[in-house]
C-alpha cells in the first residue's frame, strides 16, 4: 500500500539523514512517485541524497550539516550526526575522511560508483600524534541495551538502527 511504502521510505531517510523526525508524508510520496517514473536520477530529502542506478536505490547522507569539531576522550561515548554512537580507546580529534581513501569497496559492488560520496560522510579520528584511525562500523538496535552491544575498539562507530523497530 502507499501508506506502508511512505512509512518505510520515511524511516530509511530519517535513519540515514540523522534527523529526529521523518520528512513530511507529501514529500516522501512525491519521491516514491518519481521513483516509479523512468526519468528519476537524483533527489535530496532530509539531508539524504536518493540516487537510482540500474536496479538499486541508494540513500546516502549529504556531507553538509555534519559536525566534525569533536575532541574525543578515551572510552567516552559521543553521539555523532544523531545516528551514531562513537567510542575510542585513544584520544584525538574527529575529522572528515574526505581525503582518505578506504579502498574497501570492490569495483563490482553497486556502491563503488558512489564511494566518494560515502567516504565524505564517515568520520575519522586523528590522534594526538597525528595518526589517522579508521572507524570499525557496527549496527546496534535502539531497543537493546546499547551498553552490552558496544565494545571498546580502537575507534568504534555504531549505527543506531531505527528502521526495523
Residue ranges and their predicted role:
Residues 1-165:
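AMP-forming adenylation/ATP pyrophosphatase catalytic core
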